[in-house]
């Protein structure tokens, strides 16, 4: 996809972070922009800055199928077509670093609801309409480096992102099989300066783990700040995504720091070997240009 001027982008999670940066980049390319976010006020502020005639803010809970269907209806009613779909919304359940068996069911339901079903609902609501329009277009699904590496940490987040990777590969293959003029890019951010770790403020009451209150140590907060100082900016991530869209390239990574782990995982699978993996926090530190040994409680890549 090369011609953006006058066309329409729909971006979920557009109220902050990578989503907001994608919205601004789309607007700078001359696109109409539909900004979807559960935090409607933030989305409206960005839409106002872009310009009322070219931007529409919609409150949307991507974990809810009806909410995403309403988003699609609003986008088509306002602009008549959707040419670029960015299924970008994502969250990381907060609290202490847990092993896979320590996450509550609410953590799993919330993570899968936003990180996986948000993408599924977006594809179901928009892709058939984009195909029917017969216009060149593009779909960007935001996965994560956590979706292509192994490890014990951030299990309910990583599991959802692994599923997004597989779903996005299937989307790419399916569109190629029917000859649709729609490209697909899978964005896999490493450590990016966003508010993804602050998503607890938006956790639905139904998914709150009342028997396991969220708490994070001062050490963890300090470590996160250290990592973020040299992390990729949301604007840089958005530029990487748009470069891939323009080049019609499937994979878009914000860093090469995780390449050894990706290669090792593939080698282990082909060798039928037991998994061997580098700690994702250590890889995040390399991504941020830090070299001291990480503690066991450090945050994981977004």
Regions inferred by a protein language model and the residue ranges of each:
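SDR active-site lid
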Residues: 174-256
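Conserved glycine-rich cofactor-binding loop
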Residues: 8, 15-16
